[in-house]
């Protein structure tokens, strides 16, 4: 009887506990957690989430309940940011099996109840559930939007180590202790940590290419690399180190330190030197070098190496304490020094951040210009830039040395000193210098203030060129004093053009780097037999090979057919009548050109010269054929055939110019063409005999340049050219037949393709000459 009463009591207690747990679970309201109404829009929900996440993030809020509060905020945002889960919650009070926070809490507490009262603890303490197993992973959990918007951009400054896990994963449990130990060490060094639950974030796991759990991968500069070795502490540490580029830190010795420190002028960066007691470069220093690779060049000196005594003695370095030096324009004396027995990452980063620019940096890109000369936000945040416009030299010039010494003596928070190579940034320099001719070959100094991001600036330029004399320094100092008293002292206003990126790699190098990355990815996939990821690449390669093979075969057969057809065509060719002037298509070409097709070719005369060239609309070009009265018919026919396929472009116009009438105009243009045939003078006896027939000029009237096509000389033409010129006074013994005239324009279609591609050389002229 007592046993029955005891059993009833236990059952009643179980039911009571379950009811209480359910009621407590109902307290979780995502709308109340985020502080929004049930009719709130997605924008309001996102805004509230960002505000609360910043306030309750465990790294920023030291409140003991901050972590639990942050988890509730994240769960609430997961429910309300997904329309389907939000609808489920509004109708049923639950967001689904994957996201129901109250369900997870209920299951957790229900299991806890059974563990204490009914079942063996050794069974139910086995950590199958990911959330129960490691609550420390909660703050590292990644969602797809978080990965795309934050992790990927941040990976260009620091590498990320990401673990892919799931529920009911025995191997995940096995690697957990090693993972915790590695995370604790690497996170302190600056490595980003992430955890992806494959059950809840299938889209992100698929995006990362993780098809099994557990998986560990690294993300750096947007590139994903998988870890394939045994999960031990040393292997994971080496894996993170292998993600970093190999040329981040240069080993500096007594033999190369002068060359290393002298690179500031070419690289336009300060140089950092760390003196350490270990032969290998510390990982923390490599991570710092990666974060600031765009601003500072890093070197490492092992103090235990023979021959470094001269360096340590010159810079007064303590051999028993880690020391970091920053060098700028002067290599004999460091600009800043930090020395501590235990250099922490935050201390190093603050030290580098304060010294990431030279004393007078060179403006090599628009991004650097925005950073050094920011747009003013208020009257108290005015930033002025003193710009030295000077010519590029191999050695430091006297004007620049004087400018540097002036900058060192007049360093202020509101004034930044920079310099520009005027020969590399000509448009930028010409905007600031009022009279370029007066400053030709000389240096000038301007003081400017940016007003908006569109390039609008106000500035004041020193009237005389900058020589670095004491009088120049006195004048510049007076300008700065007047500027502090009256900001309206900068009286000139202009819109500066964007700076060209001087240090950007050329196209060939970018292409080479891309090919190298593809090859390394392919080799890694091949080694580890990741065929699922390799299939798109293999499909692309085989498709390209198939297309290439098909193109070669088609070209081979078409060439052989053309050769067979060309022989009878040559035999049937009949010279054209001399009196025919209109272009007509031959029988051979009629198969290639539609019957109703025609090419409109107008003559370039003094009447049509202005409309067809001088006032031609921007973006339009006039393709002009040079011919003579005797070659007009034949050349126009061939010209029409060659350019017919390009007549679909409305920006191309076609004309011809008679050499007998306008020879002087043509020879004036050819004087501006590089590698063109030398232009004879009027006293040369062969002056009027030079043959320009078959030349084609593509004239851009708006931008005042032209491209030149010169026909290749055939064997018959060379024979004609070798004839005695005196024979031309009598009956000529040799002349141009139809074959040479036909061959003059044989390569014109290829030239036209290059013209449309924009790969032809352009010859600029100051103005279009008169057409007499």
Curated annotation (Swiss-Prot):
Bilayer topology: Single-pass type IV membrane protein
Signal peptide stretch: 1-25
Transmembrane segments: 534-554
BP-aspect Gene Ontology terms: regulation of autophagosome size
Biased composition (Basic and acidic residues): 561-580
Ranges where the J domain occurs: 29-93
Pfam family, one: DnaJ
Protein's UniProt keywords contain Glycoprotein: yes
Spans within the Cytoplasmic topological domain: 26-533
Residue intervals of the Thioredoxin domain: 119-245
InterPro entries tied to this protein: DnaJ_C16_autophagy_reg, DnaJ_domain, DnaJ_domain_CS, DNAJC16_TRX, J_dom_sf, Thioredoxin-like_sf, Thioredoxin_domain
Chain intervals for the UniProt region annotation (Disordered): 560-591
Compartment(s): Endoplasmic reticulum membrane
Gene Ontology CC terms, in alphabetical order: endoplasmic reticulum membrane
UniProt cross-references to PANTHER family, sorted A to Z: DNAJ HOMOLOG SUBFAMILY C MEMBER 16
Record-given protein name: DnaJ homolog subfamily C member 16
Taxonomic placement: Eukaryota, Metazoa, Chordata, Craniata, Vertebrata
Chain's gene name: Dnajc16
